[in-house]
UniProtKB/Swiss-Prot annotation:
Database matches in InterPro entries: Mur-like_cat_sf, Mur_ligase_C, Mur_ligase_C_dom_sf, Mur_ligase_cen, MurD
Protein name per the record: UDP-N-acetylmuramoylalanine--D-glutamate ligase
Family in the record: Belongs to the MurCDEF family.
Species: Buchnera aphidicola subsp. Schizaphis graminum (strain Sg)
GO molecular function term, any single one: UDP-N-acetylmuramoylalanine-D-glutamate ligase activity
């Protein structure tokens, strides 16, 4: 289908990297959009061409309601009342991913999930490159997708958040996968978890091959002319699954052993699931499985994902700043099997999530919990006997440094967004790394 944007009133919401890429996209087509950013001082304001009309501060209602097409940045909720009103009037509200999907015919692998998206997307990119593809990685990681249209590629790998999928309707992926869905971003969705889940699952709508995760006893849908289903997961009712033999994880494909994880550099069940999914994707792309396995054996993981950043006096400092939801913190705690004390740094913006699931882990293990940030005080009430509240991450680390002993682990796995006190999770993780080395 061909889309004609000429003669339409086009409005771009948001002046981050996504918004700037949207401006450039339309300017190359000879179209001048309008732009609104809710901030009075957006960081990319100096990148707006002089002839572009823009407004800063609150969303300008008359600009929104007189538009024919609105492109919304992922940081702006599509459930704002003014945008819901615009939608009810028949105004199209779409993402940059939707614009991108209308323009390209190159094969796309799309990956979403609450946790593990970046890791799996990066694994698949590395495997595809070793298999001879010219690969571009974008979406929620790497390039803004519209910038990728200007570069040569034989395959796109997209990491997609629920925010991006909210307003994406025509993404025709060769392969689409939802890694997992657990509570996150509930402050964004008026109807709660089910709405968040539905948004994630929409990635399958126009995909050719759907990789789905089955729980015990579940069955995958029947293949149709337009869709093929491949399953993965922990249970052996999946096409790809994990089995433990003497506490060692073995990866299987249809009852055939394909990977012994004792030969893999990454540890932890969540990482074994990421590896399994990457193999399933690679097999569906018909990459040489030996090449895929060799890449995965050498993969060291991504920064800020359960990364040991400092060891001194037999005290380990683990940076898991990318842990921005409850489930990722739970996975980090399950990974740690030590005789010493775990000093957990937990806190930030909890995004209305339910943290009660962590209680049983706190009660079973030798742990001290230092809660900080916007929701730190409430988090400290989860397990009062083992918790201390501080305003900032730095204050918590200073207190911990006076008490840690050889054999202990200091774990930054906040389970929360960093936006209350930091620009992003990277800034939070980098502060942790800096302080771990200074204090020791």
């Amino acid at each position: 289908m061909s889309y004609n944007y000429f003669g339409k009133k086009i409005l771009i919401l948001g002046l981050g990297l996504t918004g700037i890429s949207c401006i450039n996209f339309f300017l190359k087509k000879g179209i001048q959009p309008r732009v609104i950013d809710e901030s009075n001082k957006p960081i990319f304001l100096n990148k707006i061409p002089k002839n572009i009309e823009y407004k800063l501060g609150n969303l300008k209602e008359n600009w929104i309601l007189e538009s024919d097409l609105i492109i919304i940045s992922p940081g702006i909720s599509s459930f704002k009342p003014i945008l819901m009103k615009a939608r009810s009037l028949g105004i199209d509200i779409i993402s940059d991913i939707e614009l991108f999907s209308r323009e390209t015919k190159c094969p796309i692998i799309s990956i979403t999930g609450t946790n593990g998206k970046s890791t799996v997307a990066t694994m698949v990119k590395k495997i595809a490159e070793k298999s001879g593809y010219k690969v571009l990685l974008g979406g929620n990681i790497g390039f803004p997708v519209l910038e990728m249209l200007n570069k040569k590629a034989s395959l796109y790998v997209l990491e997609l958040s629920s925010f991006q999928l909210e307003t994406t309707f025509n993404l025709k992926s060769k392969i689409a996968v939802v890694l997992n869905i657990t509570e996150d971003h509930l402050d964004r969705y008026p109807e709660g978890f089910e709405q968040y889940k539905k948004t994630k699952l929409s990635i399958y709508n126009k995909a050719k091959i759907c990789l789905i995760k089955l729980k015990k006893g579940e069955k995958k849908p029947f293949n149709t002319k337009s869709k093929k289903y491949i399953s993965f997961g922990t249970c052996n009712n999946n096409d790809y699954y994990i089995n433990y033999e003497k506490e060692k994880a073995i990866l299987f494909h249809k009852n055939k052993k394909i990977v012994d994880t004792s030969n893999i550099l990454l540890n932890g069940h969540h990482n074994y699931e990421n590896i399994l999914t990457s193999l399933a994707i690679s097999d569906q792309m018909k990459f040489d499985q030996k090449v895929s396995i060799n890449v995965l054996k050498k993969f060291l993981g991504l920064p800020h994902r359960f990364q040991t950043v400092h060891i001194n006096n037999n005290i380990s400092w683990i940076n898991d700043s990318k842990s921005t939801n409850v489930d990722s913190t739970k996975a980090a705690l399950k990974n740690l099997k030590i005789k010493g004390t775990i000093w957990l740094l937990l806190g930030g913006d909890g995004k209305s999530s339910n943290f009660n699931i962590l209680k049983k882990y706190f009660e079973k293990i030798k742990i001290k919990i230092y809660c900080f940030g916007k929701d730190g005080l409430n988090l400290s009430k989860l397990c009062k006997k083992k918790s201390i509240y501080t305003k900032t991450l730095k204050q918590a680390i200073i207190l911990i440094s006076k008490k840690i002993q050889p054999g202990d682990v200091v774990l930054l796995s906040p389970g929360c967004s960093s936006k209350d006190q930091f620009s992003n999770f990277e800034e939070r993780g980098n502060l942790f790394i800096k302080l771990s080395k200074e204090i020791n």
